[in-house]
């Protein structure tokens, strides 16, 4: 999905109204990235006529899909288009109390030449798919802060659970789950 000026402006307004969370590594920029992902996800659900309740004020989940399905959106920004072997992360500092039924992952493509704080650097959003909490806990690779993943050179700033793109439930299957929630 191409990111419009209108969407970025809406995300900036939403991000500006949020507090900086204690464990936030990127602070205001983390809020902006998260808000872009949330708006993209909301538009995706609306386009596919999936009912949802916005609960982003909570740190336990971002949305209630249908009548009961709790879901949290995780958004990562990248300088290259996402590929099937790339990872999606769930930080562990929220994991004890953030126990949604599903996590949903969005990747943002950013243009490096525009600078680290220019909100217009985000050009595209990729809706990657999701994973149930049970599957995440079963298949994810745990990384501790300071560890380096030898497959891609990433050194983790916080403990997290990682799943590869190909471990996610595809969007068409998730839409069916969401519609039946």
Which residue stretches match the model-derived regions?
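Nucleic-acid endonuclease domains
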Residues: 1-66, 74-181
